[in-house]
């Protein structure tokens, strides 16, 4: 007796189709699982056996073999419990074999209740691409999986409910897609921030062009507060960005029935004690790290010099390529990691260097040693560096309302729309000025004669690298877009240069 049931698996953040074959034959009773199963898959034997018996079926006292194809890919996790049960029951003749347009995923309890699994959305998308029309998943995963187009997703609470549906005795209603508007609510507002207009301006430029930014200032000046409000002025995520981001968070086990879709740009703020593997991703079965969880969003590193140097160096390649590769003996996995890097730091170890109160007792060598923890190549990849002054009492008590995130976002959205139209006309794939490919840089960043002269003088005086020069051009292009200027003028160049004048050698 033979049965074939379709299921799915996940490698990295991508799903793939799995064919589960169940074969019951004469011989000594036994239950073997083949096809590179890990320990969790092998343990499914006991869960499936108990679930079958506890739901009124007789477990076959025969020789049973379950094959998970393709056999050259390692199968991990508990998601094969449900398809294994369906395969055994159909091979034993207790239920009719499901059609080729059905797929099953889910972990079983001993009583036959379904428990959620990770990676529901990437598996649902893989099912849709494989031509599967109906996907049966645990009820807690249904809203997430229903975000995939062209697929009927059925929420299953337990084995009895599923068997009744397959026998057409009591049908399960397909899950509706999640409410995206509700998912995106609840981001803090810039209206809460008093003063610090120069920092708000720098963050507006960073948001408009997708630029990396470093905020330097004393404790309590509002660095973290403003950084956490940055997502509120970033452009809304497209559907494709939501899918990409949710896939990563789903594989990491960070989605939930209450919040199945990542509809607002993520903000990840790892502690400075994070390891290199925690930042980049890793594990025996590779899982995404903080830089991938920040994909399409913001990676906020507070107290930047306190991070270990080997951890900070992990950032260099993802900042250039927008992806990170994790290599293991079992294979290589690539995770997307296109994020905005937002960093904050004190001007010195004590936090009060240069403060008007005179509380700092650091020597010049102490300050230089503190700054030297950040490597030149990493600083070269930061587009804007802005100083946050200590907040004056009059500013703190000012009753005039501060500009809201919604008002700032309107200008950011307008600048991004200019960029999208420009890249579409030029045949480029970039989404914002920070990602302008080198081949398009000179064409896109047309500088006026006065601006070119200023840039030349700054290049010589500041001893800029080629990368720094390119990044100043990109920032100037964003400033010009915010001003709705076709060409980059000298004032745009001057403001862009201003954000690279913080001296890490003399401070």
Predicted regions and their residues:
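P-loop NTPase nucleotide-binding/switch module
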Residues: 167-205, 209, 236-291
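Basic, amphipathic alpha-helical bundle interface domains used for macromolecular binding and assembly
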Residues: 40-45, 60, 67-77, 285-286, ...
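Short beta-strand elements
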Residues: 18-24, 279, 383-386
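Hydrophobic anchor at the beta1->P-loop junction of P-loop NTPases
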Residues: 215, 301, 344
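Peripheral, non-AAA+ core regions of ATP-driven protein-machinery
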Residues: 1-214, 218-224, 327, 468-469, ...
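Walker A/P-loop
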Residues: 214-256, 321
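Walker B catalytic acidic pair
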Residues: 296, 302-303, 314
């Amino acid at each position: 007796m033979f049965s074939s049931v379709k299921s799915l698996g996940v490698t990295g953040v991508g799903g793939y189709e799995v064919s589960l074959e169940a074969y019951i034959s004469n011989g000594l009773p036994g239950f073997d699982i083949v096809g590179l199963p890990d320990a969790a898959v092998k343990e499914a034997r006991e869960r499936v056996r108990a679930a079958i018996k506890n739901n009124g079926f007789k477990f076959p006292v025969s020789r049973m073999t379950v094959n998970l194809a393709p056999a050259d890919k390692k199968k991990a996790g508990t998601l094969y419990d449900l398809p294994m049960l369906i395969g055994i029951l159909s091979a034993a003749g207790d239920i009719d074999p499901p059609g080729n347009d059905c797929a099953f995923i889910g972990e079983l309890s001993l009583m036959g209740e379904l428990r959620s699994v990770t990676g529901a959305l990437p598996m649902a998308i893989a099912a849709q691409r494989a031509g599967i029309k109906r996907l049966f998943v645990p009820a807690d995963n249904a809203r997430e999986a229903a975000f995939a187009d062209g697929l009927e997703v059925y929420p299953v609470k337990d084995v009895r409910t599923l068997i009744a549906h397959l026998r057409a005795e009591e049908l399960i209603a397909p899950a509706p897609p999640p409410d995206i508007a509700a998912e995106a609510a609840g981001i803090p507002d810039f209206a809460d921030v008093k003063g610090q207009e120069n920092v708000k301006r720098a963050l507006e430029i960073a948001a408009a062009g997708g630029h990396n930014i470093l905020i330097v200032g004393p404790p309590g000046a509002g660095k973290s507060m403003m950084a956490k409000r940055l997502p509120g002025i970033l452009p809304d995520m497209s559907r494709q960005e939501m899918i990409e981001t949710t896939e990563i968070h789903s594989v990491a086990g960070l989605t939930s029935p209450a919040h199945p879709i990542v509809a607002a740009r993520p903000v990840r703020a790892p502690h400075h004690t994070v390891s290199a593997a925690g930042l980049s991703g890793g594990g025996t079965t590779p899982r995404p790290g903080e830089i991938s969880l920040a994909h399409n969003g913001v990676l906020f590193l507070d107290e930047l010099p306190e991070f270990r140097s080997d951890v900070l160096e992990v950032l260099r390649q993802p900042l250039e390529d927008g992806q990170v590769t994790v290599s293991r003996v079992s294979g290589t996995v690539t995770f997307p990691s296109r994020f905005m890097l937002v960093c904050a730091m004190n001007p010195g170890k004590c936090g009060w260097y240069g403060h008007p109160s005179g509380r700092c007792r650091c020597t010049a060598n102490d300050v230089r040693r503190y700054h030297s923890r950040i490597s030149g190549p990493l600083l070269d990849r930061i587009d804007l560096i802005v100083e946050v002054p200590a907040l004056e009492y009059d500013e703190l008590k000012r009753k005039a309302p501060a500009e809201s995130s919604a008002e700032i976002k309107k200008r950011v959205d307008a600048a991004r729309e200019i960029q999208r139209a420009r890249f579409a006309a030029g045949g480029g794939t970039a989404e914002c000025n920070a990602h302008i490919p080198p081949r398009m840089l000179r064409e896109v960043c047309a500088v006026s004669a006065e601006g070119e002269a200023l840039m030349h003088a700054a290049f010589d005086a500041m001893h800029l690298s080629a990368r720094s020069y390119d990044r100043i051009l990109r920032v100037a292009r964003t400033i010009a877009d915010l001003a709705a200027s076709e060409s980059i003028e000298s004032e745009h160049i001057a403001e862009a240069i201003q954000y690279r004048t913080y001296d890490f050698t003399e401070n």
